[in-house]
């Protein structure tokens, strides 16, 4: 099937085009996109040609935080049902043979075909916008789990952008005492209100 796509055609160059999405195989799911989260960091670097993962080959379709509805499921899929609202993280969208999208995940498309193992049903009470940020939570979750904070342990988090705020909240959730620092007053204010025990303006 043909679907619309946001295609990065070069550094700071974006076009709306179309790509072919295949029917799902036995273990795959076809997802109709509702929304995709945009990361100021990763997405911003990618469009500027500064992605840290290596050289970018254009044209390419980026996007790695798809929220959508299950439109079709393969014969062996048992984890989701038709109509389920789901999140798809960094998994690459499978395209028809010959549809080149470079090295990116390719979730800036109207539909995506993904293996069921990378699809998570979204619980009731979680909005589409909240769910679309699921991909960026991976960094602070991994960091918190690797450091295994103990109750009352003091933790310093430098930077209070989206990932820093999430990290602070995750550490506090484990019982750590959290100090945050940022050079932007608005981030410090938000951090003091919802993320940190102590928020410092380090400018």
Features from the language model and the residues they span:
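Extreme N-terminal starter segment of soluble prokaryotic enzymes
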Residues: 2-4
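Residue-level recognition of beta-strand termini and adjacent short loop/turns
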Residues: 10-12, 25
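Conserved hydrophobic/aromatic beta-strand scaffold that supports enzyme active sites
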Residues: 16-18, 67-69, 85-87, 111-113, ...
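NAD(P)H dinucleotide-binding glycine-rich loop of Rossmann-like/cofactor-binding domains
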Residues: 89-158
